[in-house]
């Protein structure tokens, strides 16, 4: 607080004797910017999430993927990966590429998740437009799914999905981008399915020290 007062004085915003430190502290407290509040925020941001079984927590996300060719003229379109990752096992129970990041894509993927594995206890997503749909929130409520949403622009609170996206880009999408001919959306999804089944789900994960498929199956 003293440093802030010194800055205000040097910039001639206030005279040194006109602003008490206690007054400034009160304003910070009301605005949620006190040291105590900021320390609490820091702990919340980097708090480690612990789960003990599969589908206790599932994380959903969209991210920009490689280009695909679309239509009779083979126009290049950016594909978007939309998927769900199980926190406990790092298994991907549902994931595919779409041409749009919208409610229709979310609805399709969400249905596939439920049909294949049933509802998770908690579903963690960001504040993307698709996740704000009233019908999506109503569906989660009707199914007894606790819907948790990360704060906007706080990617560090979603470390699991960020790490998966990095793995997806480095191991799979980089290979796709290196090809001479753009794939169709169906081809891209077929390759993704094979990569998940034969590579990602079988490789030992550095944090769990188990392969995602094995850890998911045993829990």
Predicted segments, located by residue:
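A short acidic/small-residue loop/turn micro-motif
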Residues: 97-102
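Residues immediately flanking
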Residues: 62, 87, 127
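Active-site-proximal acidic segments at structured loop/helix or strand boundaries
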Residues: 171-219
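A short, amphipathic alpha-helix used for macromolecular contacts
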Residues: 1-20, 63-70
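Mobile-element integrase/transposase regions
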Residues: 22, 26-83, 91-92, 103-112, ...
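DNA-binding alpha-helical recognition surfaces that contact promoter or target DNA
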Residues: 6, 22, 26, 190
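Short small-residue beta-strand/loop micro-motif enriched in glycine and branched aliphatics
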Residues: 90-95, 148-150
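RNase H-like two-metal-ion nuclease catalytic core shared by retroviral integrases
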Residues: 123-127, 131-143, 147-173, 183-189, ...
């Amino acid at each position: 607080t003293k440093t802030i007062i010194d800055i205000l004085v040097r910039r001639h915003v206030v005279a040194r004797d006109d602003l008490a430190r206690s007054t400034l502290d009160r304003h910070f407290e009301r605005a949620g910017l006190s040291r105590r509040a900021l320390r609490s925020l820091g702990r919340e941001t980097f708090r480690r999430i612990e789960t003990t079984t599969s589908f206790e927590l599932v994380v959903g996300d969209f991210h920009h993927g490689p280009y695909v060719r679309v239509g009779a003229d083979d126009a290049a379109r950016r594909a978007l990966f939309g998927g769900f990752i199980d926190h406990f096992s790092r298994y991907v129970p549902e994931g595919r590429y779409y041409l749009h990041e919208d409610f229709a894509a979310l609805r399709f993927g969400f249905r596939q998740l439920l049909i294949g594995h049933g509802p998770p206890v908690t579903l963690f997503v960001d504040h993307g437009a698709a996740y704000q749909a009233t019908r999506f929130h109503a569906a989660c409520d009707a199914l007894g799914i606790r819907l948790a949403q990360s704060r906007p622009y706080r990617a560090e609170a979603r470390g699991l999905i960020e790490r998966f996206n990095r793995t997806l880009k480095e191991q799979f999408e980089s290979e796709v981008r290196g090809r001479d001919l753009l794939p169709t959306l169906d081809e891209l999804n077929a390759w993704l399915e094979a990569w998940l089944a034969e590579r990602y789900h079988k490789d030992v994960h550095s944090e769990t020290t188990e392969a995602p498929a094995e850890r998911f199956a045993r829990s």
